[in-house]
Amino acid sequence: MEPASSFDGMPVDVLIVEDDPIIALDFEDTIAGFGVKTIRTAANVARALSMIADRAPDFALLDVGLVHEKSFAVAERLQALNIPFAFVTGYGADTALPAAFAAKPRLPKPYSTDALRALLMSGDVRP
């Protein structure tokens, strides 16, 4: 599966997996400002996996630490589908990731708009 992108290099459909509704809304607003057409959010792993099964995104942002769970099952599914993704964490570069994801990009919280834009447009995030 090849991710779609708009003429400006932005993905067309972004999935945000984030359990904090304020942070999720902030991501939505910022990403919408980049011209992304479809932005979906999931607050837990089960919902994210269901959304991916219904319609795979072109890119995903995964909060590492969700309430009572980690987002690694979502990362595994995205990687199997060859969909680019990045981890978002408030714990910095020291956040332990499974070896399979150690090289995946990370976006720190709080994030800068420029860093988020570059991440979404970067060819480096493709698995």
Language model region names:
Residues 73, 80, 91-109, 113-114, ...:
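Alpha4 helix (beta4-alpha4-beta5 surface) of REC/receiver domains from two-component response regulators
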Residues 1-13, 108, 112-127:
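Non-catalytic signal-transmission and effector/linker regions of two-component phosphorelay proteins
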Residues 18:
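Conserved acidic carboxylate
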Residues 63:
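Active-site residues of response regulator receiver
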Residues 86-88:
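Hydrophobic/aromatic residues positioned on beta-strands within the core alpha/beta folds
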Residues 44, 68-73:
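Acidic catalytic/metal-coordinating carboxylates
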Residues 21-40:
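Two-component/phosphorelay signaling modules centered on CheY-like receiver
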Residues 41-59:
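Acidic, metal-coordinating helix/loop segments flanking the phosphotransfer/catalytic sites
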